[in-house]
Amino acid sequence: MTSITHTISEIQKLTRQAISDARPVVLIPTMGALHEGHLSLVDTAYSLELDNPFVIMSIFVNPLQFAAGEDLDSYPRTLDADAAKLATHNHQVHAIFAPSPAEMYPLGPRTTITPGAAALRFEGATRPTHFAGVLTVVNKLFQITQCQHAIFGEKDFQQLALIRQMVADFNLPVHVHGSPLMRDHDGVALSSRNAYLSDTERVEARRISAALRQAAMFHVKHDIIAAAINAMAGMDIDYIDVVAPDFSEPTAGNELYGDARIITAVKVGSTRLLDNMAVNVEKPNA
């Protein structure tokens, strides 16, 4: 049976007991409105083959990561439906932590994390306060739950890289695991914001993953990007690029070759959609 907790003291009581029982604590942070992509994070937690893990899913629409004019107020909040989905999933979530903003920030967000240079590009350029909010709440969740493992989806690839950076820079005793990006039957990357799309916009959104698949057939960085842009001609592309898995910037003598990601954000109607795909970058022929 899944416990639903709303206070820090409640979830800490459960995690203290789990730690006392020598059970590894696994945290899956989400904002709710669960879909199959979120459920796959639970499957990833169990794929770690830990001994009797205590699995927590946090469901919290974090106001710190939304800027003025974004969809904080309209973001779907479906705790009862989320709990029902978890109850019927084939792998158990032992506790849901669903705090209020007042519970997480009783005196307001007085102390926040500055993510650094890697957060200034791509999502950070469009949403300059976003990653400070993400890293602040993730760090709080790590401290509250005292988790040893945390699962994050690879759809938000820049976010995953920044969380790994924070863990390394702050020497946090947490193993961060990426869970593969999940797609719907039509190839669209699973996202809670897909619910905003009209039927016509949904058809348009399919072009994004199709473009990335076409781009991944190429191996020179310029050709990869050009193929994706051509395949998404006429779409409202925010950014598209090929990046290192850790989002480090290539330098002279240390160019990006080998395993990489093509990442993009595209606006379809009023909805910004993120997607990415693994690519292999080779040196161009002389």
Swiss-Prot record:
Q: Which reaction does it catalyse?
A: (R)-pantoate + beta-alanine + ATP = (R)-pantothenate + AMP + diphosphate + H(+)
Q: Which residues bind ATP?
A: 31-38, 153-156, 190-193
Q: Which UniProt keywords apply?
A: ATP-binding, Cytoplasm, Ligase, Nucleotide-binding, Pantothenate biosynthesis
Location of the protein in the cell: Cytoplasm
Q: Its pathway?
A: Cofactor biosynthesis; (R)-pantothenate biosynthesis; (R)-pantothenate from (R)-pantoate and beta-alanine: step 1/1
Kindly indicate whether the keyword ATP-binding belongs to this entry: yes
One Gene Ontology term of the biological-process aspect is: pantothenate biosynthetic process
Which molecular-function annotation in GO is an example for this chain? ATP binding
| DNA damage listed as a keyword | no
Which major enzyme category is it?
ligase
Q: Which InterPro entries match?
A: Pantoate_ligase (IPR003721), Pantoate_ligase_C (IPR042176), Rossmann-like_a/b/a_fold (IPR014729)
Q: Which PANTHER family match?
A: CYTIDYLATE KINASE/PANTOATE-BETA-ALANINE LIGASE, PANTOATE--BETA-ALANINE LIGASE
Q: What does this protein do?
A: Catalyzes the condensation of pantoate with beta-alanine in an ATP-dependent reaction via a pantoyl-adenylate intermediate.
NCBIfam families, per database record: panC
The misc remark on file is: The reaction proceeds by a bi uni uni bi ping pong mechanism.
Assembly behavior? Homodimer.
Entry-linked HAMAP family: PanC
Q: Which family does it belong to?
A: Belongs to the pantothenate synthetase family.
This chain's protein is named: Pantothenate synthetase
Species this protein is from: Corynebacterium diphtheriae (strain ATCC 700971 / NCTC 13129 / Biotype gravis)
Organism ancestry: Bacteria, Bacillati, Actinomycetota, Actinomycetes, Mycobacteriales
UniProt lists the gene as: panC
